[in-house]
Amino acid sequence: MSSSPNTRETFRLHMGWLHSWLGLLAGLVLTCIFATGTLSVFDTEITHWMQPEIPLTAPPTLTAPALTHAAVLLQNGEAKGAFPFLLLPSRRDPVLRVLNYNGHAFIGPALAADGHIFPARQTAGGQFFFNFHFTLYSGVFVGSTLVCLLGLLLLVVAGAGIAIHIKALWPNLVVVRPFAAKPRAWLDAHLLTGVLFFPFLIMITYTGTVILARAIFPTHPFVQHYVATSPPKKSKPSVAPLAKPSPIPPLLPLVEQAKTLLHTSDCRFILFSPTEIQIFENDEDTLFANKSTAIFSRADGHFLRVEEKNSASAQARGLMQGLHFARFSSFLLRWLYFASGLACTAMMAAGLVLFF
């Protein structure tokens, strides 16, 4: 039995109230989140622009002298209580970097192929926008939780907006009156961008919310029960804690071995612990941002194990990360992400203008 016109109109009125007030309360922060996320599409290029001392003409080459000097810098950082890691050259950033997290961004020196340090200024660069986009510059837990909640609100607001205008989607696509009265012109801009870029808006909001969901959603009770009742795994021989990290073995042979073990042409970064060296594959050539890992002993460099993320849940999460971060994208697709992000930002800004 079909619903009566009065019922449908009441539903649209309720959706309009929800769309208006939730959009007003969360819209300003969401506009900032989308604006900084749009700029983050070119975060590496922004960092290059802010570090003109680093030449970008050389191809991404990883050499033994650069890795040897990087290992020295890394050990010096560890001696000061820091936890630096190595970011390996890639097609977008063809230099070796020794990075350390300062609470908001990863900063550190960049090394040339012969091992010398480029005299570049220390700056967060494009990572400032990336960090603001995901944490509002408010810390990993508090900021990520707030951004995740705002993402959920945006999904509700977008759904309510479609419920309001579902009967007029086609007119909203073809009717644009830039010289009409200002409220009408702003509404047309809001509706046009909202309808045209609605698929992108839902995709980018949903994937971003899922990525941050662990910040606010607890583990399912079934998983907790399974972990509690599953038989204990065989314990590995305990390793006595080291007073200080052991010296780092030659890294270039380990990187080449990791490429073979991970069946990849490039590795992206290297993490260090007092006992292990973890080399992660590059995910710039695949839609699934899963990053399988080859792990070696820090003491002598012998191979320990490979950690692959091939489960269905890991593949699903990797797909969400790949779609959101767009590291796989070509230069043209990256510009398409950027233009879509600008359009969504303009849509939110136009909607906010209607209130003032």
Q: What does each model-identified segment do?
A:
Residues 1-356:
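Conserved histidines in hydrophobic membrane contexts and catalytic metal-binding motifs
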